[in-house]
Amino acid sequence: MSGKVEIMNMDMKVGKTLKIKGKXDDDADGFXINLGQGTDKLALHFXPRFGESTIVCNXRDGNXWGKEQRDSHMXFXPGSEVKLIVTFEEDGFKVKLPDGHQLTFPNRLGYSHLRYLSVQGGF
C-alpha cells in the first residue's frame, strides 16, 4: 500500500456523517480507512482487499485487534472511483458504498467523539 493521509484533531461526534471520495490506484491491492482516537485506538478499520474480493472491518484497542467482520460485497477495484459515506452512530457505523450497498459495524470501543482519520494504501 502506497500513500497515507492523516487528520489528528478531527471533530466527529455521534450523528455526524463523513464523505470520502477518491480513486483507487490502477495497481492497488486495496486501501484502508481508519477512524478513532489515534493510530492504536481505532473504532473503525475499513479495509477493502481487492485480491480477496472482501471488505474487512475491525476495531483496535492498543496492540489488540478485535474479531474481523468480513463482507464479500466488493464495490471497488483497482482504478475505480471510490465514494463512501460513513455515518457515526452511538451503537456503530454505517458505511454506504458507491453502489448503494450498506455495511454496519458496531462501536465496540464505545466512543462518542472521534479525533483521528487516516486513509492509506492505493488511494
From Swiss-Prot:
One Pfam family this sequence matches: Gal-bind_lectin
SUPFAM superfamilies referenced in this protein's UniProt entry, alphabetically: Concanavalin A-like lectins/glucanases
Domain Galectin residues, every copy: 4-123
Residues reported in the UniProt entry to bind a beta-D-galactoside: 65-71
Keyword tags: Lectin
Keyword Ubl conjugation: no
Protein's UniProt keywords contain Nucleotide-binding: no
MF terms in GO: carbohydrate binding; galactoside binding
Subunit relationships: Homodimer.
Function statement: This protein binds beta-galactoside. Its physiological function is not yet known.
Protein name: Galectin-2
